[in-house]
A protein has these predicted regions:
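N-terminal catalytic cores of secreted or lumenal carbohydrate-active enzymes
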Residues: 8-188, 209, 219
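Substrate-binding and catalytic surfaces of secreted/luminal carbohydrate-active proteins
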Residues: 1-9, 13-26, 30, 121, ...
């Protein structure tokens, strides 16, 4: 139990069940014939910024926090993690795993070796059953063009589109990345082809219409995953309920499902809540009931009183947690697990007003303040 005044702070209460027939004024009726989705888990993003902050902590303090967060025996049992393939807007620098032209130059980079992998390995030592999903914020710059009608190379981390001539190389990039993490003892449960494919303006971004994503999945990514024997799931879309109000992009994953060659490789679709209404989840489920749904990103920050539990706790439980589960999502993942008290590290052009699920003081990297997103995921994971 958690109250917004923190008079009760993730308090555990024993429940005494009664055999009495009269449960008035409350009764619960179960209908075994009506079944809903099974749950894959609940969690947060382990970004470069999160890992940086965690690794500033004393090892004993860090391990205690990670145990409290991820242990399904002595902690809250967070069970789903989202990471970036290459950089995100909360990385320590802009990079991909193949910045030198030629897919033969693929290699994990220093941020992954020095920050991401050590933290993931520590988490997995605490809870080996954690599911990890991943998404790129951008392809390598040598694969980018200004647009599909102007194939001029674009050497910018922001905006641009994937040159179709590099579909196969980019699919190989995904395969090599999944295999590289596997070689480090880390299984990747799922990927999306692109984080926020309709967002041209992030510090690292790549525009990818539904037609582009369909063609990339059916001609390159799906076949290459199959040929490599990868069991990693592929989820479409990974962006907002409102499709950025672009008429031609509405029903983005549904249009991909209508293509049988692409659909065979797609487990489902992933959504964020920075625009539109969660009713779109129900619309997609009703139209494509055999496809899965995930909720993969939401943020708190200065714009929505993100550190004020009296304003955020119940609202986030209603809209983010229960609102997505009640609309068929199998997983719920919030954004940065940990930022510091200055909302850092962050990237210019990315979100510099976001809070973490927890914030840690950057004076001594010891004092941690839990925000609403930590509480809602902790409550869901503990059930």
């Amino acid at each position: 139990t958690t109250t917004n005044s923190l008079t009760r702070d993730l308090a555990r209460d024993a429940v005494n069940f009664s055999s009495k027939d009269n449960l008035a004024p409350t009764s619960i009726t179960l209908n075994p014939a009506e079944q809903y989705q099974t749950m894959d888990g609940f969690g947060a993003a382990i970004t470069g910024a999160t890992c940086f902050n965690l690794l500033q902590m004393k090892p004993a303090d860090r391990h205690a926090f990670l145990t409290e967060t991820f242990s399904d025996n002595s902690g809250f049992g967070f069970s789903y993690i989202r990471i970036s393939i290459g950089c995100s807007d909360f990385s320590l620098s802009e990079y991909t795993c193949c910045d030198t032209k030629g897919i033969e130059n693929f290699a994990l980079q220093s941020e992954e070796k020095n920050y991401i992998l050590p933290v993931l390995k520590e988490i997995l030592s605490i809870n080996p059953s954690i599911k990890i999903m991943a998404a790129p914020w951008t392809c390598p710059l040598w694969m980018k063009v200004k647009s599909l009608t102007d194939l001029t190379p674009l050497t910018s981390w922001t905006n641009g589109q994937l040159n179709p001539a590099y579909y196969q190389d980019y699919a190989t990039y995904f395969v090599k990345w999944v295999q590289a993490f596997k070689a480090e003892g880390i299984d990747i449960y799922a990927v999306t082809p692109q984080n926020e494919p309709l967002n041209r303006g992030n510090s690292a971004s790549l525009y990818m219409s539904w037609e582009e994503q369909r063609d990339f999945v059916k001609t390159a990514l799906g076949p290459q995953f199959a040929a490599a024997g990868l069991s990693t799931k592929i989820y479409a879309y990974d962006h907002n309920y409102d499709y950025s109000n672009i008429e031609s992009e509405k029903n983005y994953p549904g249009k991909m499902y209508e293509d049988g060659e692409a659909s065979q490789y797609l487990a489902g679709a992933a959504y964020h809540n920075y625009g539109g209404d969660r009713e779109e989840l129900l619309n997609i489920h009703k139209a494509y009931p055999d496809k899965e749904l995930l909720f993969t990103e939401t943020s708190i920050g200065t714009w929505n009183s993100g550190r004020d539990l009296s304003k955020r706790l119940l609202e986030d439980m209603k809209e983010v947690a229960l609102g997505t589960i009640n609309n068929w999502c199998k997983g719920v993942i919030v954004w940065n697990l940990m930022l510091d008290n200055d909302r850092a590290p962050n990237r210019e052009g990315g979100c510099q007003t976001c809070y973490g699920a927890v914030d840690i003081s950057n004076s001594y990297y010891k004092t941690i303040i839990r925000n609403s997103h930590y509480y809602i995921i902790a409550h869901l994971s503990s059930v």
